């Protein structure tokens, strides 16, 4: 009855690695290299493109699939050389941590985890982040190395192709984009996720300086106040999971007010210190706040 929603752990008993694959093309340009590979699974075909850009901090992966299977789960596996017992998965304005081992029954049944824009693995000396633009199911498992220690495998769930309630679920053409970033902090992972999901838009007009800069927090959204006052509304949050001192610089702003989610001034929001174009305030772990910036009319 819950075919499209449920994922049972025994799906791993019939796991099949796609072996019918080959490099089909290599494109070399002045600022990038693309390696195109093609693969086939029964009646379906896939293309995976590795994109290496000059000066980029990470590697991009573009996946396309012409999918015509039923009741088959398709995953993209990305092995990473890191010994760790946990992984971080982004939620809205924060992240959760889940074990990568199955030492307890609780851990074993967390075999699939939902994440928004990125997954991150870390230990004392290195870290990896994998950002995506359109898939939300992940599993990370720990494996014994042939040499010593362990390595981790990150797998993104691409399609499930259930038969109920839609017998044609996931049939047809699909595209996904990923970015693999080495030595990535939480803020690096957030940035990679934003870059994949919020593409740059070029607009015409005169150049201008940004009306504000902020450090110590992540800006999630910027909007004009709904009352048409000309005020600017920022929603910011602490992303790393610890207390942070935030500095907001807005040289043209006459005042900054901490508001609730409905843009109303609230004493429950962080206390703002400073003025004359620069304000500071404190945020606790994963705290969200809304700031209203007023400018001279």
PLM feature segments, named:
Residues 1-297:
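C-terminal (or distal) subdomains of carbohydrate-active enzymes
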